[in-house]
Amino acid sequence: IRDVLGSRGLGDVYKRQAATGTLPIDRTVVTPGQTADGRVQVRVALGDGEVLTLPLDKYLWRVVAAEMPASFEPEALKAQTVAARTYTLSKMERTVEAHPDADVCTDITCCQAYIDPADAAANWGENAQTYTDKIAAAVADTDGMAALFQGQPIQAVFFSSAAGRTVDAVEVWGNAVPYLTSVDSPEGDEVPNYHSTVTVPLDEFKSKLLAQYPQADLSGEPAGWFANLVPNSAGGVETVDIGGTTVGGGSLRTLFGLRSTSFTVSASADGVTFSVTGYGHGVGMSQYGANALAKEGKSYDEILKWYYTGIDVAPYTPQR
């Protein structure tokens, strides 16, 4: 559920699920004495087409290791674990056209990121054992817990870093989701590449924009192309008029590879420059915000309730 332009999120996945409906998956694997996660088996479609069956706790370790820096605070890692578990349990109650023989896959444009423990250890170097144990503790300490709205698993979308507030889901994907509303997000001081700049040469800007919006009038001075910027709930760009045509901030982000829709824009003969803050689609939980809240002393369930409005954090067993 990561954002393929930068951080992680659900975008098209959420819309596909909303449009297609779901079917229950019949599965029964119970071993007395196991943890709640250990009793649940997850079928994972790997990139080579193999379907691997793992206990939920082993799968979650691989997801969290891929999705969040292991150097983060323990409570932030726990919040990420619950978000990952919630997403997985929700997927287990559905069939997905992209991988009908598996509950989830390892394609981040469809499901969650995934890394093999050996690869994670290689990435972590001398910290491998510490980080391995740290993520295992995050999984064990939240065993069986999920983020629920009206008793059902939520779409626990997340992203890397916000520009001070998260974005309401309806502004990004067109679906009003009661627990995915705009909230304040303290990001802390250590966010990498929090501010970024993208300058697009005029010819490239014209070519890409007119391919999508042929009615736009890009004659005259470039500084005069832009007008009527409408902010979204996070203070970023909901829409802006370019050459007399209304263009969504998300469309500009996709067209020009911007890290978020929180940007300002300037134009001259040298090109169009976007000054961007944050990273990701902006909906749901900010990972760096979660880490900042953990540093303030908030627990994982407090972090989840901060970002997902009106939810409960409680045990959940998938409906098979």
Locate each region found by the language model.
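Single conserved hydrophobic/aromatic residue that forms the stacking wall/gate
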Residues: 1-14
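Sec-exported extracytoplasmic/periplasmic mature domains
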Residues: 65-69, 82-94, 210-214, 294-298, ...
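Acidic/histidine-rich, surface-exposed loop or edge segments in extracytoplasmic proteins
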Residues: 55-73, 184-192
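Soluble non-cytosolic domains of exported or imported proteins
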Residues: 50-54, 71-82, 199-200, 280-284, ...
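N-terminal, intrinsically disordered, polar/charged segments of Gram-positive cell-envelope systems
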Residues: 18-44
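Extended substrate/cofactor- or partner-recognition/assembly subdomains adjacent to catalytic sites
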Residues: 86, 90-272, 277-278
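C-terminal soluble interaction/assembly domains
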Residues: 248-320
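Acidic, low-complexity proline/glycine-rich segments
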Residues: 40-59
